[in-house]
Amino acid sequence: KPVLVDFWAQWCPYCRRIAPAFDKVGEQYADTLIAGKINYDEEPQLIQRFGIDTIPTLMLFKDGKALGSVVAPGSKAAIEAFIRETLAQ
């Protein structure tokens, strides 16, 4: 299954604002992908490895490879569009 990752931090107000939309997408797409979160402050090696410099950043992975990313998606619809467009490539 593809994996959708939300790189976020507790001190980031926008991260907290999109969290409910991310969680809903994770539930809605549970049959087709795995959704998870990586805390910016707790995983500096992963942040550096994937070149995350702005949060929230969502990344979509498949078979261990990053397929794409989006910074600060504005809504549940934007997250869904990112998933559809990225998986269609």
PLM features: what roles do these ranges have?
Residues 3, 44, 50-59:
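Structural micro-motif
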Residues 1-2, 17-38:
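Conserved helix-turn-beta segment immediately C-terminal to the redox Cys motif
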Residues 9, 40, 63:
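Active-site loop/turn elements of alpha/beta-hydrolase fold enzymes
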Residues 1, 8-11, 54:
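Short pre-active-site segment immediately N-terminal to redox-active cysteine/selenocysteine motifs
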Residues 7, 37-38, 70:
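Structural motif
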Residues 54, 59-89:
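Non-catalytic, surface beta->alpha helical segment in thiol-disulfide oxidoreductase systems
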Residues 7-21:
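Conserved redox-active cysteine motifs that mediate thiol-disulfide chemistry
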Residues 44-45, 77:
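Acidic phosphotransfer microenvironment of two-component signaling modules
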